[in-house]
Amino acid sequence: MFWTVFASSYTGLTDMSTEPLAKNLRPELGDFVSIIGFRSLLKGLREAVGEKTALVVAIAAGRARGRELADSFGLAGKEPELDKITSCLQQALGINGTRFCLIDKIEAIDDGYRVYCRETIGSAGEAQGSTGKLTFTLGTIQGTLESIMNKRLRGKQVESVLLGGTHDVIEFEVLG
């Protein structure tokens, strides 16, 4: 039950289908929830199941969302250029989409990919010097890349705007 409530509260999909987000799910309040509400959900999750389990669950939920995005883009398994993936993620997650975060660039690195994000939910409103990490955001991007590039990845945040970076940077290592 939690999984369905968690996922549907963010995706707007109650059946967990891969259809793109519907529009006008709520006639007066609109389709999206606030950062405050989303972060409260993550905080409650940490309090209920513990920090490590919450991290795993948030990343897994993000990966599921990322796979939905890849399917909605029609790019699952197609391995397009990284500029195309960047453009799709910008459209879906950025100012014209869910306003989840801004993706400035995805680049290939020796053993995987590096993604440059701004205005992420994980960093919004956090104090400078905070050691909080991206979880759902990392998972969303990971799930999208895994599905599109048909590769298993391991992600980690390597830079943070909270620690003086210009971006929240996530690196994904290709496994096997």
Features from the language model and the residues they span:
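N-terminal accessory segment detector
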Residues: M1-T135, R154, E159-V169, E173-G176
